[in-house]
A protein has these predicted regions:
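Bacterial N-terminal signal peptides that target proteins for export
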Residues: 3-15
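Glycine-rich nucleophile elbow surrounding the catalytic serine of serine-hydrolase chemistry
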Residues: 136-140
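Intrinsic disorder/low-complexity segments
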Residues: 5, 22-23, 118
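Cys-dependent protein tyrosine phosphatase-like superfamily
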Residues: 26-128, 141-194
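Short, surface-exposed ligand- or partner-binding patches at beta-edge/loop junctions that are enriched
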Residues: 131
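Bacterial N-terminal signal peptides
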Residues: 14-23
Length: 194
């Protein structure tokens, strides 16, 4: 008898959930997309409009589109061994914008960052994924963008970057160069750059 009462309660709860999910589709889609997006290499969501990650695959692009992303920016080289073949066509075929800025691993340049920032500033509220191979380049660009343009706390942005990696000497110097060009210091209370 107890089982007979439990089944209708479960059924009622399930029907309520289904009716709410159909009325508010984001209830179920958001849970599924977030789980799916977390499967992308080193995926970090900084806010509702901006995320970074490592290399995506074709399935990831479809999940990103379903999750409401409008723009994909790729900042590594189109190496056939590591990059997604025809990523530009795949992204655009899904109705998203695609930008490619090949940033040299051993020689990132201020103009690379400025190009990225210019793309972001055209439509800052366009949901964007910035990615490279493993989210090393992208996490540095994200740190810089968040500090310079979003005026976020440097220590907080640095902690997010260090969830992925501690930048090596080349990338630390790049960070310092970019910050200096925007008249900002890399020094903060909780910032140890060693």
């Amino acid at each position: 008898m107890h089982l007979a009462l439990t089944i209708p309660k479960i059924l009622i709860r399930w029907l309520i959930y289904l009716s709410l999910a159909s009325y508010f589709p984001w209830l179920s889609a958001q849970e599924n997309n977030q789980f799916s997006l977390d499967q992308i290499i080193n995926y970090i969501e900084y806010d509702a409009f901006y995320s970074s990650s490592g290399q995506v695959n074709e399935d990831d692009l479809e999940k990103l589109k379903e999750a409401g992303f409008n723009r994909i920016i790729y900042i590594a080289f189109n190496d056939p061994k590591r990059a997604l073949l025809n990523e530009d066509k795949l992204v655009m075929g899904l109705g998203m914008k695609y930008f490619h800025i090949p940033v040299e691993w051993n020689n990132p340049e201020l103009t690379d960052f400025m190009t990225f920032a210019a793309i972001m500033q055209v439509q800052p509220k366009k949901r964007t994924l910035l990615h490279c191979q493993v989210n090393y380049r992208a996490s540095v660009f994200s740190f810089l963008y968040r500090v310079i343009y979003n005026k976020e706390n440097m220590a907080t942005a640095k902690l997010d970057m260090e969830r992925i990696w501690k930048p090596n000497k080349i990338w630390r110097e790049f960070i310092f160069e970019v910050l200096k060009s925007y008249q900002l210091s890399p020094d903060c209370d909780a910032c140890d750059w060693s």
